[in-house]
């Protein structure tokens, strides 16, 4: 008689990271419950069709969290940065940690961002040039996870997601890609560390399957560090389209239609940037038969979602 499948509540399941985690856990025979405001959305319906159970709930609503967590032994936690100034990321993160602890959850896997925790060492940190609250919110929620007293916890810290080059995200992140251009304020020499959302799912699954190994770890996630020229060359080669990178001033980037907060983040990448120890990561994951996806392989897999008319 097989053991009862452990139940994991996945937040953000209709987004890139949560969706990847939900799919990986379903494929590993976990019982997956997704927390969603709209179970009728195509993303939620696809997961339901794959075997997930959907509960209607909201990180704003503590009573909905208690119901969603009933019987759950694990939680996958992801929050959206608070752009509206309502402290939403911390409120949601803290509420989920508290509700999970109260519900008897034993393994809490949380996704944050690479370099959170090193933020006070960034050049120009004190001037608030880098949207300090983005970094301090991420760190505060991480600290809440580590300090809550879960039997097992794991914090995943991804670098820049490859999904930003595919639809629907590319429309906002790389608005010129459709015309065969990647226009950014990244310097030609700046390398951006990349990770596929699917791989965040793979690592989260590994953490739930083998808490003994992954518990108590803060894990940076990146596989490659590429310049935008290298990104453009890879896209050109795989898609058989002309894609070229243009490095412009921050002012020019904003003028061309790249949103200001993202341009500021590009400046941060020039001056600080994600600094995951990729060789060490590859080695430690390799020992557990986890192979992260290089950018070229990711482009091949997602070619249909990368829209270039050029």
What spans do the regions from the language model cover?
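Short loop/edge segments at beta-strand edges and connector loops
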Residues: 56, 157-158, 247-249
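Acidic/glycine-enriched edge-of-secondary-structure segments
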Residues: 51-54, 83, 192, 306-309
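Glycine/threonine-rich flexible loop motifs
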Residues: 85-91, 271, 277
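Oxidoreductase cofactor-interface core, primarily capturing Rossmann-like NAD(P)-dependent enzymes
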Residues: 2-45, 60-63, 67-70, 74, ...
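A general structural signal for well-ordered alpha-helical segments in protein cores
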Residues: 93, 138, 170, 265-268, ...
């Amino acid at each position: 008689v097989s053991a009862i499948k452990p139940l994991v509540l996945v937040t953000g399941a209709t987004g890139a990271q949560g969706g990847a985690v939900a799919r990986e856990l379903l494929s590993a025979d976990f019982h997956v419950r997704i927390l969603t405001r709209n179970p009728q959305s195509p993303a939620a319906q696809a997961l339901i069709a794959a075997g997930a159970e959907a509960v209607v709930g909201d990180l704003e609503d503590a009573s909905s969290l208690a119901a969603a967590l009933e019987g759950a032994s694990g939680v996958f936690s992801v929050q959206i940065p608070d752009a509206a100034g309502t402290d939403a990321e911390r409120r949601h993160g803290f509420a989920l940690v508290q509700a999970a602890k109260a519900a008897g959850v034993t393994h809490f896997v949380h996704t944050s961002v690479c370099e959170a925790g090193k933020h006070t060492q960034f050049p120009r940190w004190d001037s608030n040039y880098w949207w300090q609250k983005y970094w301090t919110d991420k760190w505060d929620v991480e600290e809440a996870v580590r300090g809550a007293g879960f039997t097992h916890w794991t914090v995943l810290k991804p670098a820049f997601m490859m999904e930003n080059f595919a639809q629907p995200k590319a429309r906002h992140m790389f608005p010129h890609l459709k015309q065969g251009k990647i226009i950014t304020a990244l310097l030609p020499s700046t390398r951006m560390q990349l990770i596929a959302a699917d791989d965040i799912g793979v690592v989260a699954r590994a953490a739930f399957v083998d808490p003994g190994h992954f518990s108590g770890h803060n894990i940076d996630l990146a596989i490659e560090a590429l310049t935008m020229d290298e990104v453009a060359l890879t896209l050109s080669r795989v898609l058989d389209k002309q894609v070229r990178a243009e490095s412009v001033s921050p002012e020019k980037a904003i003028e061309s239609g790249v949103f200001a907060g993202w341009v500021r983040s590009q400046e941060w990448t020039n001056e600080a940037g994600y600094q995951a120890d990729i060789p060490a990561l590859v080695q430690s994951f390799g020992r557990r038969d986890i192979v992260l996806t290089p950018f070229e392989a990711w482009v091949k897999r997602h070619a249909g979602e990368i829209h270039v008319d050029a």
